Amino acid sequence: MKTLKDLGDLKGKRVLVRADFNVPLDGTTITDDGRIKAALPTIKALREQGAKVILMAHLGRPKGKVVPELSLAPVAARLGELLGITVPLAADTYGEDAQAKVAAMSDGDVVLLQNVRFNPEETSKDPEERAAYAKKIAALGEVFVSDGFGVVHRAQGSNYDVAADLPAAAGLLVEKEVKALSRATVNPERPLTVVLGGSKVSDKLGVIDNLLDKANRLVIGGGMAYTFLKAKGYEVGTSLLEEDQIETVKGYMERAEKNGVELVLPTDVVINPVFPKSDEDIAPEVVAADAIPADKMGLDIGPESQKLFHDKIVDSKTVVWNGPMGVFEVPTFAEGTKAVAQALVDATAAGAFTIVGGGDSASAVRNLGFPEDGFSHISTGGGASLEFLEGKELPGLKVLD
């Protein structure tokens, strides 16, 4: 994979950078700027070389239409604050305003192009349509840097097709992500423990499938655990359950046993009569995992499971965690996720290499107040890090070879 140093002298060059600025918004307020901060090392490195930095990114799912609420204006403002400069936002992605703003740039300037997904061609399934659109974007730059790890698992105009039109390389963030995830999947220090949570087994099938041949231990929590408990013959009440995955999960359990992979499931859970919409809905109780009443649902792992998971995680040299242990947005059901985060922090302090997979786990870690340097690596890519762990070839990385 080509990296920044393979691009040579970039002084005065127009460098197109595909970043990942898909940040959560509350109105026009950014509630977690982690992804913007993650892009700063590449932006600063290019500015120091005297490059003209042209940033592009998507926000939300505007489905190829201009949706004013999904403008990158809040991102341009936050970038300006973090860099201590003005970052102009072009009114379009490759049209007259983008061209004018790029033409007015001096060395070291930064410009942000408007949301690439305002253009239907960006996510088109027609390669020719995407390629023609990518050429229009590529005309703005002389070199392409791919630094949006959150989108490398997709073949889209601004991260895949543009790379065919310009000399292309990975930015510092993508390089860091690939190094970290490779360290967990290629000859990892053992024991390798993989902790999976989140709501659906179906989202993680490929990961489980691949890791049953690689990991020493799989720890399963979150909503997906109830399908595993059901496959063991337990009743799960009204908990989240994927009936159509029970046979698959039984197969995984058999394979784990055959491969000598330790499969760790919750031994107790925190239950509630309903999925909590507000504080009034909460009447939690802790029961054994094989004693969930018919009219209650599991919403977090219980205290015994928290200790069990903690001990298994700390007894590892490499840990990968993807997906929360419960409904962490509600404080009553956040204890399991907190316990796993704390276990990773403890494992890191004891010398283990730890990765927090992107998406919900990364948000949970930040929202629950854990220090970012408590973990070896917090990934910025949810789907991308999962597909990397599945052993899939990621199109956005392949084009950088």
Swiss-Prot record:
The keyword rRNA-binding does not apply. It is found in: Cytoplasm. It is an enzyme of class 2 (transferase). Keywords: ATP-binding, Cytoplasm, Glycolysis, Kinase, Nucleotide-binding, Transferase. GO terms for cellular component: cytosol. It holds the Pfam family PGK. HAMAP family: Phosphoglyc_kinase. PANTHER family: PHOSPHOGLYCERATE KINASE, PHOSPHOGLYCERATE KINASE 1, CHLOROPLASTIC-RELATED. This is Phosphoglycerate kinase. The gene is pgk.
